[in-house]
Each structure stands twice: as C-alpha cells, then as structure tokens.
Amino acid sequence: MEKLIESLSDAPIIDKDGYEYLVHPISNGVPMLDPDLLREVVVEVMQTADLDVDKIVAPEAMGIHLATALSLQTDIPLVVIRKRPYGLEGEVSLHQQTGYSESEMYINDVEEGDRVLIVDDMLSTGGTLAAICTALDDIGAEIVDIVVVLRKVGDSALDDTKFDATSLLDITVEDGDVTVH
C-alpha cells in the first residue's frame, strides 16, 4: 500500500460548497493514474475481497477502472451501474445522493440469486453505496462483499443499512490535509 499512501500526500483538496473534496488518481483519474498504483490497489483488493461471486458490480464512473482490472485478473464478469438508462428489460433505477451531487443510476444484468462483489473507489458520504446496496438487495442479489479503496472516517449513509464495506485505507480530509488512519 506504499504507492497508495504516497499518492495521498500529493493529492489536491478542493472546496465544493463547503465539502472538502479529495482529487485523487484512483477516485478521479486526475492527476494521471500510474499503472503501478492501479496494480497495487487491485492486488490488495484481490487479497481483501471475498471473490467467491458470480459478478463484480461497480458504479460509473470511477469504479469502472478498478472493477475492469479486477475482472481481468479474476475472470469474474463485470457489471457497471450506469448513470443513464438504456431501457433494457429488467433495468432497475435507483436514486443516489452524495455530499455534493444527486442523480439516478441504472442496474442491468443483475438478477435474483446472483452473488455479487461491489467495488468502488471511495466511501465518503455513503449515498451511492447505500442506494446501490438497497437496490441490489431489492433485486434479490446476494451482496457477498463490498470493498472500497478509500473510506473517509465518519458517519455515512451506509451506516443506516445492513451492509458493511471493507476499505483498503481509512482517511480523514481536514483543513486541506489527508490523514491515513
């Protein structure tokens, strides 16, 4: 986790209407994502996650690169939860709200009985993951594991659900600085 920890010290923090937003290669693709950092993170996810699943599920946009690399390494199929509808049969919509945005997302190709691993870049306010978990649960999928690369320490909307996420690193962002816990 050396590269991940090192990358946090170089990551800019911007203010989004009073919310300290970490701009990081894993969570934003900016600054440029070094392949060694992505590889380190994916190897760590593989060692952390329960991979006895039918599908890897990741939200658009910044979960995609992690889940793609993980899918390539594990040969587990990947489902992307999209930000726009396609109107396909069985498509399920969900409403997600974070500390800085609100939108609809759409799930395709997850069915009752599917065993899924959810992978995402960041757990901050928890709005996205809480909405995804609730929707997958409503579909009847079994959420076997949830792994995020970074988790901001503090309350999150995921706390109000029956689901727990494992993080590779827990952080705080305060006064423009990132602290690893």
UniProtKB/Swiss-Prot annotation:
Broadest EC class? transferase
Say which family it is in: Belongs to the purine/pyrimidine phosphoribosyltransferase family. Archaeal HPRT subfamily.
Which InterPro entries has this protein been placed in? HGPRTase-like, PRibTrfase_dom, PRTase-like, Pur/Pyrimidine_PRTase
Question: What keywords are assigned to this protein?
Answer: Purine salvage, Transferase
Pfam families documented for this protein: Pribosyltran
Q: Does the record carry Transferase as a key word?
A: yes
What does this gene product do? May catalyze a purine salvage reaction, the substrate is unknown.
EC numbers: 2.4.2.-
The record ties this protein, via Gene3D superfamilies, to: 3.40.50.2020
BP GO annotations: purine ribonucleoside salvage
Q: Supply the name of the protein.
A: HGPRTase-like protein 2
User: Keyword Transferase on this protein?
Assistant: yes
Alphabetically, the GO molecular function entries are: transferase activity
Instruction: Report the SUPFAM superfamilies cross-referenced here.
Output: PRTase-like (SSF53271)
